[in-house]
Amino acid sequence: MELCFNEMTVMKNGALPEDIALCAQAGFSAVELRKGTLLRYLRGGGTLEALRQTLEEQHVRAASLNALESVSFQTKAGGRMLRELSEWCFAACRVLGCDCMEVIASFHVPEGTSATAICRETADSLLRLSDAAADYGVRLALEFMAVPGSSVRTFAQCAEILDTVDRANVGMLLDTWHFCAGGSRPEELSALRGDRLFMVHVSDCPARAPFTAQRAESYWPGEGDAPLEELLRSVRATGYDGPCSVEVMDPNVLALPAGDAIRRAAETMKPLLARVER
């Protein structure tokens, strides 16, 4: 599997194109670009073409652009804004040589909406985005999130939505923190095809009852209680051989200088992947 770094981990102190050089120095071959950081770079006078050149010079590929948020249960005006933003993001992906975009379902669902209705609405929204993304050669990776308000909270729910969509360019983003925090188990992955899994985020999680962990309790691999080695072995058994991207939301980590955080991410992730791939 591919060693990848997620810019969310340095969202406070990171910057482009500097993060890319730091990732290369630490041994990462891929990076997930954060939309907000990318926009800040462009507003400061940078260009997509120059950023792609930096990626190529540093031998780091853009594995994903993150994220399109609240893609479901949109108002008419919100839907129009989402279409405009998604078209820009997909076009940016093409320039950057990036073939994947993270998508997140809505956190604002009408009270009393059934699980079946959430599945159908989310699937319909993904189908519309899928058509637009396909024109740019972009895949959509739906992330389930085991946090309050999320309309897609579990691995099983996400898998059901993907079965409903059934498109080659729509798959899953599996975050080990959300997987464990939502009470999912490694054996559940046996039903998942590797080609349905587009991205894996890795961070550690404390032992908590399902849906009670706080997002700030997202730690470096090996500093929590999640069975990360077992979980990543189960991921690998599906046939997945793509990016394993370090994303840590601990406020102490977010406060670190970008270089320190990127080096620490490599130090904790490299041994874990080595054990998984023995």
Where are these regions (language model features)?
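Histidine-acidic metal/acid-base catalytic patches
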Residues: 1-4, 9-29, 52, 97, ...
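Transmembrane beta-strand segments of Gram-negative outer membrane beta-barrel proteins
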Residues: 1-3, 60-63
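Active-site-proximal loop/turn and secondary-structure-junction residues that shape catalytic pockets
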Residues: 9-11, 35-37, 68-71, 105-109, ...
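Active-site acidic/histidine proton-transfer and metal-coordination neighborhood
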Residues: 14-17, 54-57, 74-171, 181, ...
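Conserved beta-strand positions in the central sheet of alpha/beta enzyme cores
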Residues: 32, 64-66, 102, 141, ...
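Glycine-rich, proline-tolerant flexible connector loops at the mouths of alpha/beta enzymes
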Residues: 32-55, 106-111
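Short glycine-enriched, charge-decorated loop/helix-capping segments at active-site entrances
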Residues: 40, 77-79, 116-117, 215-221
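Catalytic-core regions built around general acid/base machinery
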Residues: 47-58, 125-132, 188, 230-234
